[in-house]
Amino acid sequence: DRICTGITSSNSPHVVKTATQGEVNVTGVIPLTTTPTKSHFANLKGTKTRGKLCPNCLNCTDLDVALGRPMCMGTIPSAKASILHEVRPVTSGCFPIMHDRTKIRQLPNLLRGYENIRLSTHNVINAERAPGGPYRLGTSGSCPNVTSRNGFFATMAWAVPRDNKTATNPLTVEVPYICTKGEDQITVWGFHSDNKAQMKNLYGDSNPQKFTSSANGVTTHYVSQIGDFPNQTEDGGLPQSGRIVVDYMVQKPGKTGTIVYQRGVLLPQKVWCASGRSKVIKGSLPLIGEADCLHEKYGGLNKSKPYYTGEHAKAIGNCPIWVKTPLKLANGTKYRPPAKLLKER
């Protein structure tokens, strides 16, 4: 008789790294990682995703919407996730804004971070009768309203003295909390400045003016810049020689804010009432279809593997986990080379 011993074997192209034995050849593996390719951004599956703050506000930037430009008034949909599609928000129409003096560029991004956002139905203060008045409310030909008349931002009132065009010591107005559902109140305010001749004509004082806002433990001070600004046109409107500085303050439920001002103040009017949290991620529009995950570098991803390699960046949703190198799960046995046949005895 012949007695032969041996083991089954097969070629093994699979190598896995183990914690105890280093690289090991195995008979089978399951890949656990994928390398995504860049795609368009999408709506996040199972939740509401917000692109533009106001999808129905045509030809409006998010800053237009946040400031209440007359032709950019509309409903902001609730959303659990938001796309930050204007990394550095562009300017708003109506009036040239000195963006670099305040955090106003952050206002649209602040609003994006809330799930529910609504504009109050009435004004937070009576601007015409504010301290230092009576005032008439200034408008801009570059800011037409729905009736094609001159208008201004819904969140602010440009307080121009009616007849007491004289210099004034700092005046104080209290800004009450008027939101009704325990939301954060975002109150927008600012001030106007121009050349000396215009300041004297509008306000009776051509000197730099002082302004202070205070709310929720945060106090901010400003001094207006008086000078000959070059004419600037916003969104094809009329050339403007003046500039406005716009800021905002966040008031917590029941908390009163204060604004101390001199001439040229833009008093708060309608305020934003915001609640809940919305996850924000940098991306681009339009949103096409749905995806399991939104990734800053790759756009919309559908999760096919538990891990991914490639560019590491912020992601929201049901996302694979980033790893530096590909991972494999061994689903076979350790490879053994073919056994040599024993010689006949």
UniProtKB/Swiss-Prot annotation:
Transmembrane residue ranges: none
Q: GO molecular function: any one?
A: host cell surface receptor binding
Q: Where in the cell is it found?
A: Virion membrane; Host apical cell membrane
Identify the InterPro entries for this entry.
Capsid_hemagglutn, Hemagglutn_HA1_a/b_dom_sf, Hemagglutn_influenz_A/B
Q: Which domain of life is it from?
A: Viruses
Tell me what else is known. Major glycoprotein, comprises over 80% of the envelope proteins present in virus particle. The extent of infection into host organism is determined by HA. Influenza viruses bud from the apical surface of polarized epithelial cells (e.g. bronchial epithelial cells) into lumen of lungs and are therefore usually pneumotropic. The reason is that HA is cleaved by tryptase clara which is restricted to lungs. However, HAs of H5 and H7 pantropic avian viruses subtypes can be cleaved by furin and subtilisin-type enzymes, allowing the virus to grow in other organs than lungs.
Q: What's this chain's function?
A: Binds to sialic acid-containing receptors on the cell surface, bringing about the attachment of the virus particle to the cell. Plays a major role in the determination of host range restriction and virulence. Class I viral fusion protein. Responsible for penetration of the virus into the cell cytoplasm by mediating the fusion of the membrane of the endocytosed virus particle with the endosomal membrane. Low pH in endosomes induce an irreversible conformational change in HA2, releasing the fusion hydrophobic peptide. Several trimers are required to form a competent fusion pore.
Q: Which family does it belong to?
A: Belongs to the influenza viruses hemagglutinin family.
Q: What is this protein called?
A: Hemagglutinin
What gene is it encoded by? HA
